[in-house]
Amino acid sequence: MRALRLLAMLASSACHLASGQTDDMCNAQDRTYSTETMPAGTHQPYDKLNPVVGMLSTKFYVTVVNLTPHRFMLEGTHSYQMDIFDFGDVPQGRARQNAVKYRGTWSTRDDAGEAYYRIDGTDKRFALRVKSYIPSSDPRRVVLDLSGMGLGQREYVYPGGDTAVSLVITGSNRFGFQASLRHGPGNWMRNMYDVIRDRPVRHLIMPGTHDAGMSTITDKIVSIGSEENTQNQGINIYDQLQTGSRWFDLRICSVHANDDAGRNNGFWVMHVNDEMATLAIGNTGESLDDVISEINRFTSENPGEIIFFAMRYLVGRYEFPDRGPILWNAAIVDDFFSKLRAIHNRCLHLDTNTGFQNHKASYFMDHNEGKGCVILLLNGHLDGRESPADGIYDIGRMTIRDHWSNRMQASDMVPDQVNNWRSVTRGGGASDYGSFMIAQWLVTPDAVATTAYSLQNFAIQPTNPSLYWAGVNGMDPEHWPNVLMVDYIGVQQRDQWAWNRLSAEMYTLAVGMNLYMASENCDVGRRRNPLLRRGEMGMVESRGVPWNGIIFANGTTVDDPDPMLHLGRVEILRNGTVFGNGTVVEQSMPNPWL
């Protein structure tokens, strides 16, 4: 019998080989992406940005993004003193915004709820917990407990009223899992080289940062631009690179003495209402020297990446910017180009006969002896905007569709962006979209609103969280943008910009979109989805030492906790606790899910 089974296996293998269906070839029949309709989500109402109104909110969300070939199965829930505790399955390739509504406006120490998930086809499990802590300035918290996957636990505070905490998971049981509780290696592209090397750049998905150098206010011009209405990022270029960004919207100006236009006080990142206006309103951010230093630090530590810097403005302004722009003369241009030549891993003499978006990823990643490419694209007010011998190129070398919604509310911006990327198709021969698409996942509030509530709050409360349910559910293997450009990348809590306070949703989303979503499209990933291949070495394994620690809400990390410690876990279910099937506990009992 054993011999017969062996012969059957060999015959089956021979049939697969004869039909060309090896384990390394993409087969449309392997597709796991789910097309089922997800429950509608809810955007944060505008009035909740008011901290007084937001503080009185009783409704919050926990969003789960599934970029794996496995269904996330809800096994059960229980809640205490909650009017709504609505959790459900998360199918492959989809996201679910799970809703929580507390019974009372003021939290008590007894408010609690737990949702237990199993990853279908595996022995992996995770739990989502909502708990109140009294006394505390941030009493309502969420714990994402992935210790059952070997990925640790993290405690979060909601960024505002009617807002979400998000969890992104990618990978597979065969490949290994990765989640957004913490950042992975800085060189995420190099880590998936075998996955993306043969894909053209227009088939890659990457994070981008809007007004990337505006991570600080340096006041090199005299204007009313402030942190609230002019700063767009909380972390510098180096940390933006570490959080996964590979497309940088960088706006550079020279700053000149009021009494001497010929005296250049240096090149600075700038964010103003109009760089060509008679009166420019805004402020300066990082110096170009600091930006270059941060780029070089990152690339020395993380070789092999493709990094784009799209540089705009490229004019001068007086310290008091009320006399219009100063167009750069040859001396200023030479000085600027000299600065750019200090950037390491520029790619000289690239083939410009082919649009950069059509080159394979490996073309750039293999440059500089495998150290990758820092690609400088100039798009400002210059004549002669390139020097290929220096690795400096006109932005026209790349066909780009850069879509800005110009909407104040996330609820208006989101459908506009989704409709834009769904208007084109990825893969499919002649129908394959040939340009590089930038989705500006941004809102554009007016000056009054930004000054009152800040660009930071607009980013971390209504806008960025919506990407992980509305944005993800607007994508599928044939429809997605190349760049997801955001403000305040990595920032989950207001003004918490230290590395240990950042969260890795955008990083993990980028990894998962390339690893899972694009790989589900056989016209994009000609090789079999790496998450389904036998014997595939995953990113998780390549990271080395496994981690199953705990990150607390204040950023404190415990790398080797007691295995019985699970933040927010309810040991005894009190009478009045409601199970997911509607059963109400009449007498306190041990938690059956432990």
Language-model regions, residue ranges each:
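Surface-exposed substrate-engagement region within the catalytic domains
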Residues: I343-E478
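Long, acidic (Asp/Glu-rich), low-complexity accessory segments flanking structured domains
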Residues: Q21-T243, H256-E301, I306, V443-G535
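Conserved, mostly hydrophobic/aromatic
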Residues: R251, F309, L484
